[in-house]
Structures are given as structure tokens and as C-alpha cells.
Amino acid sequence: MAYVITEPCIGTKDASCVEVCPVDCIHEGEDQYYIDPDVCIDCGACEAVCPVSAIYHEDFVPEEWKSYIQKNRDFFKK
């Protein structure tokens, strides 16, 4: 399992998460950041520093943002 960046990131794109990620698995997209699920080590460092609380462990993404799990995976299939 990995962490997922959800809707609150859109329009904010604060790079605090990128700066603290020890494995550089967070990538910038057009509208938000994305976490590479194949590289994420589940350390949670990104979740703690997100100023808009947009980052959740995949198992705990709120129901209204569950679609971001697939959106995140699809970003890395390109």
C-alpha cells in the first residue's frame, strides 16, 4: 500500500511533501502532485507536512476522494 494525494492539493501544490520524501516518489502533475505507489515506502513523512491535509494512506482515503487512488495509479501508467 502507498500514500495518495487527494483533491485538496489541486490548486495548492505546496512542495513540502516533495522536500521530505526520502525516496523521491512524489512527482508534479499539471494540477497536483502524485505519489508513485511502486516507489513509496509508506513512511508517512509527506502526510505530516501537507499544509492542506491532502495526503492519506491508501487504506484511509475518505470515501469522497477514493477515485484519487486510481487517478494516482493512472498517472504513473503514462
UniProtKB/Swiss-Prot annotation:
Keywords: 3Fe-4S, 4Fe-4S, Electron transport, Iron, Iron-sulfur, Metal-binding, Repeat, Transport. It comes from the Bacteria. Changing D14C: Transformation from a 7S to 8S ferredoxin. SUPFAM superfamilies: 4Fe-4S ferredoxins (SSF54862). Pfam families: Fer4. Gene3D superfamilies: 3.30.70.20. [3Fe-4S] cluster binds at C9, C17, C50. Monomer. This is Ferredoxin 7Fe. It comes from Hydrogenibacillus schlegelii.
